[in-house]
Structure formats: structure tokens, C-alpha cells
A protein has these predicted regions:
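Conserved SAM-binding loop of SAM-dependent methyltransferases across substrates and taxa
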Residues: 38-49
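Flexible, glycine-/basic-rich loop-and-beta segments that form/coincide
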Residues: 182-216
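Short, glycine-/aromatic-enriched active-site segment of Class I SAM-dependent methyltransferases
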Residues: 128-144
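Short, small-residue-biased leader/transition segments that mark boundaries at the very start
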Residues: 1-6
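Glycine-rich helix-loop-beta junction characteristic of Rossmann-like nucleotide cofactor-binding loops
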Residues: 20-27, 89-90
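S-adenosyl-L-methionine
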Residues: 54-103, 107
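Conserved class I S-adenosyl-L-methionine
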Residues: 27-37
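A short glycine-rich, Lys/Arg-flanked "PGG" loop and its adjoining helix->strand segment in the class I
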Residues: 106-121
Length: 216
């Protein structure tokens, strides 16, 4: 359906932006797209030279047919990211993307970290609407208060570092979430903390910049 194509393209735009801004090279890499849905991120990885992509989603029958038929893609349906382990994959995963809804990244980061090989990289979409708590949402499901965005990013950075992931870079997603929420993309590395470049990040300034960039 046309709406599926649109959804896939929107997803692809987000990871495409991350590849550009973060200077990612996926050439020849084995990747996992967690929360694959229609496959926007999977498609993007292939376009950026990925050798193989595991398209993982808790749902069924969502992945675009062209990707289902692609020998470089394994469609892993009905898989809950919370319970993923490295054993699930028959090859070491060098790059993970995460575009998850209705669940906090705090609940899946341990599993994702376990699945990523040493030195591997991860790009996660931070969605404040699934992190901030119900009290932070307005009637339309939007997290309007900048303070809540600052809190979400601060807490997640602590959570990622506690799992031994170095937070390298963060950027604003070029498109809002389907519900109209501002979202962020973060690059994490399964490496020692010398790779952590966000220790000096002024999160409040970064959030203000994000809000200002979407002012009409």
C-alpha cells in the first residue's frame, strides 16, 4: 500500500541522516534492524553497502515483499527485542539500528548490547513519547516540555553507559515521529569509554536547538 511505502521512506530518511551526520560506513557489515516494521532502515542499510541484515520485529507480515525476497535479508518476525541474545544470530552482528515503539529503550538496551560484537556500533532512535512517562504527554500524545526531553536524554545516556556503551554522537531526527513528536538519533559504540564524546554535551542547549529547528 502507498501508506506502507511512505512509512518505509520516512524510516529510511532517519537512518540515512544518521549515516551522513555520523559518518557511518556499513560496507560489508552484518547488521540487525530492530523494530524493522516495513523495512525502511533495512533498505537504507543495504543501500549503504551492508552485506546482510537481520530484520527483527515483534509483529508479523510487515516487511516489504521486495526485502522478504532479498537474499541479503533475513525476516525475523514475532521476536521481542527484550529477550534477544547473541545466540539468536548465526553471525556476529557489527551494526544495530533500533526504531522501537511503545517500549522504553531502558528495557531493551541490555539485550541489544549483548547482541553487538566488540567494537560494533549502534544507532538508536530516541522517542521521548515512549520514555517520558504518561504525565509528560499532552492530549495529542506529544511531549511538549523541553525539560522532559532533557530528562529523557540524560537518563538514557546514564543507562547506555551503565551497559558499557560509549555515547559517540547525537543528532536531531530530520523527520518527526508519526504522532508529531521530536525524536533524536544517537550513535553508541561497544568500546571503552574513551570513545564517549558526549560527556561534555550541554543537553539543555541541544534540546533547545532541536525545538528551534522545527519552529514553523
Amino acid at each position: 500500500a502507498a501508506s506502507d511505502v511512505y512509512k518505509r521512506q520516512r524510516g529510511g530518511l532517519k537512518l540515512d541522516h544518521a549515516c551522513d551526520v555520523f559518518g557511518l560506513d556499513l560496507t560489508g557489515k552484518v547488521c540487525a534492524d530492530i523494530g524493522a516494521s516495513t523495512g525502511g532502515f533495512t533498505q537504507c542499510m543495504l543501500e549503504h553497502g551492508a552485506e546482510f541484515v537481520y530484520a527483527v520485529d515483534v509483529g508479523h507480515g510487515q516487511l516489504d515483499e521486495s526485502l522478504c525476497n532479498d537474499s541479503r535479508v533475513k525476516n525475523c518476525e514475532g521476536v521481542n527485542a527484550r529477550y534477544l541474545t547473541a545466540n539468536f544470530f548465526d553471525r556476529p552482528v557489527q551494526f544495530i539500528s533500533g526504531d522501537l515503539s511503545f517500549i522504553s529503550l531502558k528495557l531493551v538496551i541490555k539485550s541489544l548490547c549483548d547482541c553487538l560484537c566488540d567494537g560494533g556500533e549502534m544507532v538508536l532512535l530516541i522517542k521521548p513519547q515512549f520514555e517520558a512517562g504518561k504525565q509528560a504527554l499532552n492530549k495529542k500524545g506529544i511531549v511538549k516540555d523541553r525539560k522532559d526531553h532533557v530528562r529523557v536524554i540524560t537518563e538514557l545516556l546514564g543507562c547506555f553507559r551503565a551497559e558499557g556503551l560509549a555515547a559517540e554522537k547525537i543528532t536531531i531526527s530530520p523527520v518527526k515521529g508519526g504522532d508529531g513528536n521530536l525524536e533524536y538519533l544517537i550513535l553508541l559504540k561497544n568500546a571503552d569509554m574513551t570513545a564517549d564524546k558526549l560527556g561534555q554535551l550541554n543537553i539543555k542547549e541541544f534540546v533547545n536547538e532541536a525545538f528551534d529547528s522545527f519552529k514553523d
